[in-house]
From Swiss-Prot:
Pfam family, one: PrmA
SUPFAM superfamilies the record matches: S-adenosyl-L-methionine-dependent methyltransferases
NCBIfam families assigned to the protein according to its UniProt record, in alphabetical order: prmA
Coiled-coil blocks: none
Binding site for S-adenosyl-L-methionine: 139, 173, 195, 242
Protein's recorded name: Ribosomal protein L11 methyltransferase
GO cellular component terms attached to this protein's record: cytoplasm
Record's catalysed reaction(s): L-lysyl-[protein] + 3 S-adenosyl-L-methionine = N(6),N(6),N(6)-trimethyl-L-lysyl-[protein] + 3 S-adenosyl-L-homocysteine + 3 H(+)
EC number: 2.1.1.-
Gene Ontology terms for molecular function: protein-lysine N-methyltransferase activity
Family: Belongs to the methyltransferase superfamily. PrmA family.
Species whose genome carries this gene: Nostoc sp. (strain PCC 7120 / SAG 25.82 / UTEX 2576)
Length: 306
């Protein structure tokens, strides 16, 4: 049974899609997929059989009902079944299609041909079991924020000869590597990508090769900020971090140690109601929130050093 997975299926109102996806990820699902049909939505999540028993699944059903009740929507319906690993690895792919994000990106599933004559930056992606397909609001907000940051080069990044200084970025909680690859395509000279999940790091390596990114420009590693401190030669110019709010708050002191006065950062994975707590933690360690972008119940904080 080691290669057997739970497939969880949640039928819900479309307005609950992000909330259900977040709940599944928090529950430990290694991958999620969703399909919208009018005002309704089917969200699927996958996790190894050893990670949950039937009582755990019943508790998940109650949490989903409570989440819906809190925002005045009808309760979702949760069903589950056991599937083999081979079926799990391919079952969600039928729901994922090419997606434009922001003004410049196109996320293209690796198993589909790349569109011809596109003027967008194409990220070919096979997330495997890692978070980050471009479907989630937080990933979209981070990519759009990277567009803004890397198209507006600060004067401090311009050398005396008028040339742009190389931009070094840290991606904390890299997942599939989608944000790291996006940063490289936008012109970042080098991205250090870390994740505590070894499967996410493996996915980033695979997607780096899939997009033919020079290994010198994208360096994945297992770990967190402690590993970044060993990898980087100097403080980074930019930081992108799309993980849960509680984890961001815990990491803020360490993140500040790898920054310099001109460093900017992008934080997401934050529910709107959690934004104040995250902003307060950042301000205590010398950061100021420049803008907060919202999408559905999620937000993204664009910050800089004070």
């Amino acid at each position: 049974m080691a290669n057997t997975w739970w497939e969880l299926q949640i039928s819900c109102e479309s307005a609950l899609e992000d909330s259900v996806s977040w709940r599944l990820e928090d529950f430990g699902c290694r991958g999620t997929a969703s399909e919208s049909k009018g005002d309704s939505c089917l969200v699927k999540g996958y996790l190894p059989i050893f990670q949950a028993q039937l009582l755990d699944l019943a508790a998940l059903g109650l949490w989903l009902q409570q989440d819906a009740l809190c925002i005045g929507l009808s309760s979702p319906t949760l069903t589950w079944q056991l599937i083999d690993e081979e079926d799990w690895a391919s079952s969600w792919k039928q729901y994922w299609h090419p997606q434009e994000i922001g003004d410049r990106f196109l996320i293209n599933p690796a198993w589909l041909p790349s569109p011809e004559n596109s003027d967008r930056l194409i990220i070919r992606l096979d997330p495997g079991v890692a978070f980050g397909t471009g479907n989630h609001a937080t990933t979209q907000l981070c990519l759009e924020s990277l567009e803004m940051r890397l198209s507006e080069v600060p004067k401090s990044f311009i050398s005396k000869g008028g040339n742009q200084e190389p931009v070094i970025i840290a991606d904390i909680g890299c997942g599939s590597g989608i944000l790291s690859i996006g940063a490289v395509l936008l012109g970042a000279q080098k991205v250090y990508a870390v994740d505590t999940d070894p499967l996410a790091v493996q996915s980033t390596f695979s997607n780096r090769a899939l997009n033919e990114v020079n290994p010198e420009r994208l360096v994945p590693a297992e770990g967190s900020v402690d590993i970044l401190k060993k990898l980087i030669e100097r403080p980074v110019d930019g930081i992108v971090c799309n993980i849960l709010a509680d984890v961001i708050i815990q990491l803020v002191p360490e993140i500040s140690e790898i920054s310099k006065p001109s460093t900017w950062a992008i934080f997401s994975g934050i529910l709107v109601e959690q934004s104040t707590s995250v902003a307060e933690a950042l301000e205590k360690h010398g950061w100021v929130v420049a803008t907060m972008w919202k999408r559905k119940e999620w937000c993204c904080l664009n910050v800089r050093r004070t």
